Every structure is written in structure tokens, then in C-alpha cells.
């Protein structure tokens, strides 16, 4: 009987330890301001902007990122660049990504499932997004794929972002890789709360 009780106690402790180790995502929510002096590979729009910020809202189930760019002129001869990797919500994101110039909030499910939908605007498009949370909850890997019809056929833009929350929760580093018909862009964005 004692052996059974001891075994049950050990099993219960293991179950509790596993449950605690499956960390929830860190708190990425808040308004984050880009520190251009610490960031690398910024687009001309971001370099010339008066300010760039991310407004992140987060619940247990999802995270939404809205990029806001104030000031700064679009690059000559093209659509504005340097915003988020394709929007996909209705509303006011002013940044435009390399992949087709779609602004607006981007929402990702935090359970690891894909989010898909359609975007309106000048070029109707389809998007697929996925978020993966690290075991410690301090890193979030985001992937986005936007597909739309261009004058020469289907255009695809993909973006991956690794969001790393600082230990004190006051810094956010984003490593971004984007690919589109305009080329490949790698950048590191450093934000402060």
C-alpha cells in the first residue's frame, strides 16, 4: 500500500511539473517604439519615418500586431515599403510590406494553428499565418504568406519573424526575413516599451 501511495505521489509531482513547464507566452502586449539606432536593415520608409511603433494586443488565444509609421516619404518610384509583412485585417495600419503593400493588423493564433483569410484593398489577396511559442514563452516565431494576382500572374510574398522578449519585458527584438518578387530583405528591429 505504501509503495502504491509513493508511486502515486511521484506521478502526481511529475504531472504537475510537466504542466508548469508548458509555459504560456510572455506578455508581448503594449506599444513598442522602434529604436532606429539599434536596428539594422531598415527599409527607406522606416529610416525616414519620424516614428515607427508596433501596438501589440494579446489574449490567451491570439496576438495581434499593428504597425504604425508616422512621417517619412515612400521610396521614389514605388509603393511604400518597410511595413509589416502583409496586413490582413480591416483598418488602419499605415505600414506596407514588401509583399504587395497590404497594411492593417496581423492576428496569429497562439495555439500553433494556422490562421487564414482574405484581404481587400486594391489587390484582393489571401493570407496564411502561423505562430509558434518557445518552451519558455519568451520567443515567438511568426510566419506569414500572402498570395495575390499581379499583372503577370500569381505573386507570393513570405515573411518569417522571430520576436524575442527581453528578460525585463521592456525590450523586443524582431529578426525578420522577407521574400517577394522585389527580392529578399533581412532586418533586425529593436523596440522599446
Predicted segments, located by residue:
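Positively charged n-region of N-terminal signal peptides that target proteins for export
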Residues: 1-7
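PEST-like low-complexity, intrinsically disordered acidic/proline/serine-rich tracts
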Residues: 23-193
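Bacterial N-terminal signal peptides
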Residues: 7-18
Amino acid at each position: 500500500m505504501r509503495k502504491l501511495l509513493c508511486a502515486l505521489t511521484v506521478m502526481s509531482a511529475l504531472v504537475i511539473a510537466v504542466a508548469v513547464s508548458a509555459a504560456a507566452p510572455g506578455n508581448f502586449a503594449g506599444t513598442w517604439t522602434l529604436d532606429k539606432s539599434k536596428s539594422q536593415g531598415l527599409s527607406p520608409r522606416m529610416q525616414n519615418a519620424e516614428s515607427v511603433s508596433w501596438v501589440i494586443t494579446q489574449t490567451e488565444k491570439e496576438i495581434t500586431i499593428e504597425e504604425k509609421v508616422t512621417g517619412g516619404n515612400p521610396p521614389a518610384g514605388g509603393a511604400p515599403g518597410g511595413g509589416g509583412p502583409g496586413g490582413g485585417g480591416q483598418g488602419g495600419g499605415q505600414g506596407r510590406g514588401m509583399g504587395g503593400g497590404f497594411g492593417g493588423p496581423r492576428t496569429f493564433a497562439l495555439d500553433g494553428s494556422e490562421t487564414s483569410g482574405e484581404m481587400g484593398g486594391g489587390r484582393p489577396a489571401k493570407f496564411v499565418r502561423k505562430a509558434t511559442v518557445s518552451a519558455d514563452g519568451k520567443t515567438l516565431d511568426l510566419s506569414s504568406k500572402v498570395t495575390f494576382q499581379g499583372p503577370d500572374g500569381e505573386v507570393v510574398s513570405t515573411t518569417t519573424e522571430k520576436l524575442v522578449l527581453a528578460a525585463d519585458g521592456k525590450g523586443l527584438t524582431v529578426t525578420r526575413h522577407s521574400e517577394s518578387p522585389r527580392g529578399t530583405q533581412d532586418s533586425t528591429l529593436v523596440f522599446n516599451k
